[in-house]
Design a protein with these regions (language model features):
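Glycine-rich Rossmann-fold phosphate-binding loop(s) that bind the pyrophosphate
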Residues: 21-22
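N-terminal Rossmann-fold NAD(P) dinucleotide-binding loop
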Residues: 25-26
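N-terminal Rossmann-fold cofactor-binding loop
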Residues: 50-57, 73-74
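Conserved Rossmann-fold cofactor-binding substructure of NAD(P)-dependent oxidoreductases
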Residues: 63-87
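NAD(P)-cofactor binding segment of oxidoreductase domains
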Residues: 83-125, 161
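Conserved Rossmann-fold NAD(P)-dependent oxidoreductase catalytic core, especially the SDR/UDP-sugar
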Residues: 110-151
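Conserved beta-loop-beta element that borders a ligand/cofactor-binding pocket
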Residues: 161-185
Length: 191
């Protein structure tokens, strides 16, 4: 006999798409899969995690971590069709391309997600405190106006602006995290 409770809970299982599943993305996944699955008195199924990857050689590694790899490349929007309706929650950790003042990768991403007709409900974008520019030691907090001067920071500001506009028009709950320098194994700011 079918257990309808189990079947119904499988359909409520959160689906999370990670864009940029490198060091930080994998740490996020570890927390998502190992953390408590109860919140405010409700118990939830562990999330189903997908990761966009342009490197097929990483697929086996991602699968070992409990992640379902999805082939695609933010620089080639024609490869992104698989993610249009894939998940209701998106965590965007991928950096912008290396040149220009506009983040074409984020633009490509939201263009394809817009084809999902409202399937994305929550979107987290990891930006950088670099958007505040060099304040020469002055105090900076989230209410400080951005003063992006580098091309990279301008691309991040562009992504934030485009995402805000998209989120308002799509009814998406958007969170932008402006993270300072990220350090870890092989990520130290010394030569």
């Amino acid at each position: 006999m079918l257990d309808m409770t189990s079947i119904c809970s499988a359909f409520r299982r959160p689906r999370i798409l990670i864009i940029g599943c490198g060091d930080i993305g994998q740490r996020v996944v570890t927390q998502l899969l190992s953390g408590p699955n109860a919140h405010l008195g409700k118990t939830y199924a562990k999330p189903k995690i997908f990761a966009l990857s342009s490197s097929p050689e990483r697929f086996a590694e991602l699968r070992q971590q409990g992640i379902t790899p999805i082939g695609g490349d933010l620089d080639h929007p024609e490869t992104l069709w698989r993610i249009a309706r894939l998940a209701s929650n998106v965590i965007h950790l991928a950096p912008p391309q290396n040149e220009g003042e506009h983040d074409l990768r984020t633009r490509n991403l939201i263009q394809i997600l817009s084809q999902g007709a409202g399937s994305v409900r929550r979107f987290v974008y990891v930006s950088t405190t670099g958007v505040y520019g060099n304040r020469h030691g002055d105090y900076v907090d989230e209410s400080s106006p951005p003063l992006a001067t580098s091309q990279r920071a301008k691309r991040r500001m562009d992504a934030e602006s485009v995402l805000r506009h998209w989120a308002i028009h799509q009814g998406v709950n958007l969170s932008i995290l402006r993270v300072p320098g990220i350090y870890g194994p092989n990520r130290l700011p010394i030569e």
